[in-house]
Amino acid sequence: MVATNDSEAPQKILYESLCTVEAENLSEACNNAIEGRRAPAGRKAQVMRFIGEMCCCGDMFGTDTSINESVFSAMTYIEKNAWNVKDVFISPESEENVSNCVKLLELNEKIDYSAVHLKDIAMGLRIYVEQNMRNIIPLNVRKRVIEAYGSNDGEMKETIIPRIPFVVGDPHRLFLKSLKNIFLTIEMNAEDNGVNVEEIYRIFGPLVIRRPENMLETDTEVLRQILVDLMKADFDEFPSSFYL
């Protein structure tokens, strides 16, 4: 693992420098914190030993659930080109093109970006996520974060949100990171383009933070705010305290 150096700030660790065992330990520790459980006896000493070592494992990107490469390709294209397009994710140009984009994403085939309007690609991605990505964030984490926002528990929010990037599988972490980059691109140019950023978060809140069966009445505004805060989280580095 690789730690960033800043004598005036808590030690930060690059997630991509972790080996498989370290990533699993981090995920377990973050889950324990989210669930309000203490780490097992001896785990702190074990973790601190990990922090002091460099790991040479190269297999940390093994995935538990895959996401088609065509999805990431489309997200990269949207990120690069959405800065001057109004109503991205909100309205399409062609329903037929949207349907074709969804099919291509499902078949893991690349979209011909030169032949399709960006709004149709974005809408295709939105529908693909709605239909195919139902467990981006684990059920137990969704329950806990909805409870925290429903009761406006500030301490619980601060515990859960920054740890979510490290309890999801790597494909979903990369998906959320790509989504964050898209939103940043749209937000930076929202005023000039008259974009309703809040509506985009309102659309994706229920898609990313899926309502558990016993929480179907959760207000969409709660899910929107969770996503807004999650998109401010650091997906690349985490403090060493997350291990404890």
Swiss-Prot record:
This is Uncharacterized protein ECU09_1400. It comes from Encephalitozoon cuniculi (strain GB-M1) (Microsporidian parasite). It comes from the Eukaryota. SUPFAM superfamilies: GTPase activation domain, GAP. Pfam families: RhoGAP. GO terms for biological process: signal transduction.
